[in-house]
């Protein structure tokens, strides 16, 4: 079984020989490390870089983020996905200001008291910013460690995950824990790849048990993938005057803050039920969410989108507003807007595609 003296020198020498130059690696500021680690969760590095740079220019410190409105935060995050990350960053920044005099806790245990910070993020911040020998365990590290010890157990099971956390804790060195953890993550990102690991380039190849036994393609062990559910969803571009136009007003709604895509704006609608036409689904959903009457019109566009655990086909229709004062029965807020001012609001990617189609077909904005 590989031990810390076997692993750390090899990994740190590889790191020192040349690692990726990324914006967040040019500082040990705990706030900057925190922002980068949250953005990098389930998101590619190339995607994160421009978002990180814009974020740090707009919110350069905890106080700036804590003092911003949630709408401003979500707008800056727009397009990055997994919006609960942005909401949690905002709430945790306010928590830091209120409970910690504007300074992040300096230990992994203390960091985990903040909203949205779990064991991985806490370990990354504590090791990189504060030199605490705290372990990290994300998808990349799970893959590296599972191959390193040739782990035959299902990596999605709690007992296996706990064993991997213990292994990670045993291997992290007291000296340069932040560099070690970053090297471990970069190794998983660039060399110890999921489908075709580049073992000839790996600094740990000579101590990797899976490499020695030829089982690296079989590690980590995971259960067969389940079929991803698919749903048909409807959305209405509800025109105040009933007629689509480049300068006409249409209705948008804000999703409840505590749900999926919470706080984002969208064209109102919802999921089609069995045996229901798309138009009937739109009428029903609008009544349930807003208590207003509409008449569906022409089909506008169809958007396919995959989320983490399900897929949707979004069918967007023009619709006319027939009456009733909008009530917030299933929404947090509503607004009547035009194409000229709709960009002030934060939308998910599916609704941005509807807006793009509106502009292409009507002009304006």
What do these predicted regions represent?
Residues 237-239, 316-320:
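Short, well-ordered beta-strand micro-motif
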Residues 318-362:
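NUDIX/MutT-family hydrolases
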């Amino acid at each position: 079984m590989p031990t810390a003296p076997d692993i750390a020198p090899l990994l740190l020498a590889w790191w020192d020989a040349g690692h990726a130059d990324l914006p967040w690696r040019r500082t040990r500021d705990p706030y900057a490390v925190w922002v980068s680690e949250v953005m990098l969760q389930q998101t590619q590095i190339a995607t994160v870089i421009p978002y990180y740079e814009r974020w740090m220019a707009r919110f350069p410190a905890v106080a700036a983020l804590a003092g911003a409105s949630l709408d401003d935060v979500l707008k800056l995050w727009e397009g990055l996905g997994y919006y609960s990350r942005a909401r949690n960053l905002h709430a945790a920044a306010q928590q830091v200001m209120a409970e910690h005099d504007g300074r992040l806790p300096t230990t992994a245990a203390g960091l985990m008291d903040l909203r949205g910070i779990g064991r991985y993020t806490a370990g990354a911040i504590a090791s990189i910013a504060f030199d605490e020998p705290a372990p990290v365990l994300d998808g990349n590290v799970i893959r590296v460690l599972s191959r390193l010890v040739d782990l035959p157990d299902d990596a999605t099971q709690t007992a296996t995950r706990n064993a991997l956390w213990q292994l990670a804790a045993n291997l992290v060195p007291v000296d340069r824990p932040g560099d070690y953890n970053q090297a471990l993550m970069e190794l998983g990102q660039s060399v110890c790849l999921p489908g075709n690991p580049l073992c000839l380039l790996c600094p740990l190849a000579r101590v990797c048990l899976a490499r020695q036994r030829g089982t690296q393609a079989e590690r980590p062990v995971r259960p067969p993938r389940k079929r991803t559910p698919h749903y048909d969803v409807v959305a209405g571009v509800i025109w105040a005057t009933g007629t689509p136009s480049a300068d006409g007003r249409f209705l948008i709604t804000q999703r409840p803050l505590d749900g999926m895509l919470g706080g984002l704006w969208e064209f109102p609608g919802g999921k089609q039920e069995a045996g229901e036409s798309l138009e009937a689904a739109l009428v029903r959903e609008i009544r349930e969410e807003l208590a207003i009457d509409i008449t569906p019109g022409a089909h506008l566009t169809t958007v396919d989108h995959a989320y983490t655990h399900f897929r949707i086909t979004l069918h967007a229709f023009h619709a006319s507003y027939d009456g009733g004062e909008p009530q917030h029965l299933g929404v947090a807020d509503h607004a009547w807007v035009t194409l000229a001012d709709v960009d002030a609001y934060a939308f998910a990617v599916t609704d941005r595609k509807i807006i793009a189609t509106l502009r292409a077909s009507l002009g304006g904005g």
